[in-house]
């Protein structure tokens, strides 16, 4: 088990109940003053709204759970998540097994690189966990339109561990890439439309960063847009891309870059299929490498097969 405080527990409980490998998620109160409290008293007793997550370690690792944790919080916000304010809404990771601390520290170290501000998430042994009142359990299942400060739909996206796909040195990148790949990924240039390798390819598989191998897109989300470049309705996971305002060529666009490699990928536009979210990720073929579904297991991407099927 691991105990996660991430603001209002209604959405957090529902989110983790949808994560593959999680066996149970229970709302409660943790690490306050004393081993008794209730919803009306937690602002006085110092407890944090917390979810007890029971998981199958053969299906999901603690690190993967913690990456889910960081996906849905602002770790630099003290005593505030979403619209909720107060010490009961602080973020925290509370553990019962000392061996978990090394994994928690590893994730903290990795995530600290993503933020300019200091991470203020508590990490501490669990002192006590008090199960919340019954009306709080499965709250959003009982009240589908109830308040929720997080995007629960993100629970279905795979968690991709950035540390598995480190960025090579500048020298290594230059040696690895072709001249055209280097020009596009490192110099932010654009390849020609309708004459690139993936614009009209729709075989089953995934597309990874040509620099790092980090998974970026799935063939399941690829569509024919008529623009002459590979087009996707979404990334394989919201975690693997970064966005940047691009004002080149007297236009204002949103550039898409890869997370680990910081490679220029292309741009995202709002003229995509409405039934798939309305976005069009227009991506340079030179920025990505296709991994056929049949090769995914052998190349270490077997954990993403469900994102293709």
Curated annotation (Swiss-Prot):
Disulfide bonds: none annotated. Coiled coil: none annotated. Pfam families: PMSR, SelR. Its EC number is 1.8.4.11, 1.8.4.12. GO terms for molecular function: L-methionine:thioredoxin-disulfide S-oxidoreductase activity; peptide-methionine (R)-S-oxide reductase activity; peptide-methionine (S)-S-oxide reductase activity. InterPro entries: Met_Sox_Rdtase_MsrA_dom, Met_Sox_Rdtase_MsrA_sf, Met_Sox_Rdtase_MsrB, Met_Sox_Rdtase_MsrB_dom, Mss4-like_sf. Gene3D superfamilies: Peptide methionine sulfoxide reductase, Peptide methionine sulphoxide reductase MsrA. The active site is at residues 8, 282. HAMAP family: MsrA, MsrB. Has an important function as a repair enzyme for proteins that have been inactivated by oxidation. Catalyzes the reversible oxidation-reduction of methionine sulfoxide in proteins to methionine. This is Peptide methionine sulfoxide reductase MsrA/MsrB. It comes from Streptococcus pyogenes serotype M3 (strain ATCC BAA-595 / MGAS315). The lineage of its organism: Bacteria, Bacillati, Bacillota, Bacilli, Lactobacillales. The gene is msrAB.
């Amino acid at each position: 088990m691991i105990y996660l405080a991430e603001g209002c527990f209604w959405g957090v409980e529902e989110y983790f109940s949808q994560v593959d490998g999680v066996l149970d998620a229970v709302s409660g109160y943790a690490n306050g003053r004393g081993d008794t409290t209730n919803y009306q008293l937690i602002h006085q007793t110092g407890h944090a709204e917390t979810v007890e997550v029971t998981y199958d370690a053969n299906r999901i690792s603690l690190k993967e759970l913690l990456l889910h944790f960081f996906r849905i919080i602002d770790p630099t916000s003290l005593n505030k998540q979403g619209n909720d304010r107060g010490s009961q809404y602080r973020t925290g990771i509370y553990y019962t097994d000392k061996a978990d601390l090394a994994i928690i520290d590893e994730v903290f170290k990795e995530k600290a690189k993503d933020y300019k501000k200091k991470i203020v998430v508590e990490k501490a042994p669990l002192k006590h966990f008090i199960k919340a009142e019954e009306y709080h359990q499965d709250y959003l299942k009982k009240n589908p339109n109830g308040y929720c400060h997080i995007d629960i739909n993100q629970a279905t996206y795979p968690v991709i561990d950035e540390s598995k796909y480190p960025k090579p040195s500048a020298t290594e990148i230059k040696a690895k890439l072709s001249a055209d790949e280097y020009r596009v990924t490192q110099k932010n240039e654009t390849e020609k439309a309708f004459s690139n390798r993936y614009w009209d390819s729709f075989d089953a598989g995934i597309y990874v960063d040509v620099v790092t191998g980090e998974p970026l897109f799935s063939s399941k989300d690829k569509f024919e847009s008529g623009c002459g470049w590979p087009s996707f309705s979404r990334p394989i996971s919201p975690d693997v891309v970064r966005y940047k305002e691009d004002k080149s060529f007297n236009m204002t666009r949103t550039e898409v870059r890869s997370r680990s490699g910081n490679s220029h990928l292309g741009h995202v536009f709002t003229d995509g299929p409405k039934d798939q979210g309305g976005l069009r990720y227009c991506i340079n073929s030179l920025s990505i490498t296709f991994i056929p579904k049949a090769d995914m297991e052998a190349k270490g991407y077997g954990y993403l097969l469900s994102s293709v099927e």
